[in-house]
């Protein structure tokens, strides 16, 4: 039996490849060494200058574009981080292989054996490499750039290339709390965003589940007709529906005030002659937005829930009937738990989606009416406030990036807690 020293193999791997060569995996060792040589050449020729520019963000206005330097630096930083992960994996690999050799476990030595081992044991990982590469540059890279911008002074007074950007640390985050204008705006917008996400999402979920339960009842005739009707809000493009309903809620000539309310006034006399300020009063605008999202969002929940209901065995309901359970007890103990067990991730995603539902806020009333300071309208949510911060006459890109990071932290934290509490991905008990 061979006697390898794992600590010696790990120590030799400080120069990638040497530990593998020590373990008599020469093919792997030379590949690791080759990767390192290529990286060193790349780092000296390309990455090092760009990372230096990332730190300084330029020193001569007009010639140096700080924003481009930041983006290019972030791009090369990804490759450096990937190599660092490879570097430490190389040390761990040498140490692990040495221990396996000492334990008499066969290890691939030749290039042919290594390829065979990768094909037999690592083929699934090879298939997902393109996905990881795409995710890195489509998701992680923009996130890194946004994160970096949040720590700069990128605004209308510092627009590259005529002006240089500077690193300002946590200034943008502290300004949200220290500057009265931004503090009041952030508090108002955040509170409305939370109310909006909870109210609108809950409404569309309740309507969707309710209509699905009704449509699934055996005594309902013409189920296909009901299905088509319930899917209409989903079939029409959302932006068309939003613009149409926005016109219907017009204070003076909208169909709601001129036609619907007079009809309701015959049943509800207190509505006689009422003209509700849907578009000019923030409270009524918020109510209209919540109702509209309930209408737009429930068809998806309806389709999802209907499929779940049709998969629930009738034996459960028959047993509950024999035990004397009423309709509410059947729903609470059978129907709702089954819906929640299957659809919990989707239901949670409705809340996260509405937390960032920009289109309805922008198309319905442009975030108005009125303003709460800091460039935010009275019905702006965080994502639409970010839009205002970046497209206004005095854009605040770094502040918008800071708010974006705050949104991300809130959404990710709440989603992870909800997934964990609801055991959203635990399907063993379904």
Map each language-model feature to its residues.
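Central hydrophobic cores of alpha-helical transmembrane segments in multi-pass inner-membrane proteins
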Residues: 8-16, 204-205, 209
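Alpha-helical transmembrane segments and their helix-start/interface "positive-inside/aromatic belt" motifs
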Residues: 15-35, 121-128, 227-233
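Generic hydrophobic-segment detector
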Residues: 3, 7-9, 14, 198, ...
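Transmembrane helix recognition focused on a "late"/terminal membrane span
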Residues: 1-9, 27, 31-120
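A structural signal for multi-pass alpha-helical bundles of membrane permease subunits
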Residues: 44-54, 60, 91, 123-430
């Amino acid at each position: 039996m061979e006697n390898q020293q794992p600590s010696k193999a790990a120590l030799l791997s400080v120069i990638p490849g040497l530990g593998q060569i020590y373990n008599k995996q020469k093919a792997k060792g030379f590949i690791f060494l080759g990767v390192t040589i290529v990286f060193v050449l790349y780092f000296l020729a390309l990455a090092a200058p760009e990372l230096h520019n990332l730190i300084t963000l330029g020193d001569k206005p007009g010639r140096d574009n700080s924003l481009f330097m930041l983006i290019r630096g972030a791009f090369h930083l990804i490759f450096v981080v990937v190599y660092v992960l490879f570097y430490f994996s190389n040390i761990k690999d040498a140490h692990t292989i040495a221990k396996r050799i000492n334990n008499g476990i066969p290890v691939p030595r030749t290039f042919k054996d290594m390829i065979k081992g990768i094909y037999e044991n690592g083929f699934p990982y090879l298939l997902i490499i393109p996905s990881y590469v795409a995710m890195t540059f489509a998701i992680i890279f923009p996130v890194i750039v946004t994160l970096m911008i949040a720590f700069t002074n990128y605004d209308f007074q510092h627009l590259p290339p005529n002006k240089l950007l500077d690193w300002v640390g946590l200034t943008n985050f502290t300004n949200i709390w220290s500057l009265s204008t931004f503090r009041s705006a952030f508090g108002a917008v955040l509170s409305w965003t939370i109310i909006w996400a909870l109210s609108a999402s809950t409404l569309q979920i309740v309507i969707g589940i309710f209509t699905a339960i009704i449509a699934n009842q055996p005594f309902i005739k013409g189920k296909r007709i009901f299905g088509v009707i319930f899917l209409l809000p989903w079939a029409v493009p959302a932006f068309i529906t939003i613009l149409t309903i926005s016109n219907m809620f017009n204070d003076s000539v909208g169909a709601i005030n001129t036609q619907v309310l007079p009809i309701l006034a015959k049943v509800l006399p207190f509505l006689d002659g009422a003209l509700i300020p849907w578009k000019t009063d923030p409270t009524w605008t918020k109510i209209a937005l919540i109702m509209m999202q309930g209408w737009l969002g429930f068809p998806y929940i309806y389709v999802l829930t209907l499929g779940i209901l049709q998969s629930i065995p009738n034996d459960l309901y028959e047993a509950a009937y024999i035990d004397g359970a009423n309709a509410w007890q059947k729903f609470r103990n059978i129907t709702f738990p089954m819906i929640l067990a299957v659809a919990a991730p989707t239901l949670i995603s409705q809340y996260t989606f509405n937390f960032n539902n920009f289109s309805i806020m922008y198309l319905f009333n442009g975030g108005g009416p009125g303003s709460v300071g800091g460039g935010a309208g009275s019905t702006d949510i965080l994502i639409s406030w970010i839009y205002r911060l970046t497209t206004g006459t005095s854009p605040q890109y770094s502040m918008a990036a800071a708010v974006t990071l705050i949104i991300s932290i809130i959404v990710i934290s709440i989603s992870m807690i909800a997934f964990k509490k609801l055991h959203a991905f635990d399907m063993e008990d379904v």
